[in-house]
């Protein structure tokens, strides 16, 4: 009986909504990779300035498979946010795979894959976010990721 439950849960997990965003960024893959993995660089672009209370963005990374990361900030309205997860795959300057869960809803864990490919003098970045809780979560994350990638592009270029 447990295996049936597990199978049903696994089937549901793989059929959840996902999103894929591709961007060409005018910076080398190594620079983009560092922007995702170095906490000092991460806080330079992660977050939309108009929505963040200045000086509240913090990031921690333990960059190894099984290592954890955490990003926290306070919004201008005073609400606190924290997202984090575990690194599942790391290929320097090429690929990062990590779990993604807001600490307010840890049961809604999903997975993010960042792929970086050289493209002339720049990088083709592909962000694939899968196993999202529902369509509303997918749509909200699509909006958020697009805003964040705008910030990353400005930071790295």
Predicted segments with their positions:
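Hydrophobic/aromatic beta-strand elements that line small-molecule binding cavities or substrate pockets
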Residues: 23, 58-59, 83-88, 100-101, ...
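A conserved amphipathic terminal alpha-helix motif
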Residues: 1-4, 14, 130-157
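Hydrophobic pocket/interface hotspot
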Residues: 32, 42, 69, 87, ...
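Hydrophobic ligand-binding cavity/cleft-lining segments
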Residues: 1-53
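Short beta-edge strand/loop motif at the mouth of beta-sheet-based domains
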Residues: 20-21, 40-80
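A short, structured loop/turn motif at beta-sheet edges
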Residues: 29-30, 64, 88-94, 115-124, ...
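Intrinsic-disorder/low-complexity, polar/charged segments enriched in Ser/Thr/Lys/Arg/Asp/Glu/Gln
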Residues: 16-22, 29-31, 68, 82, ...
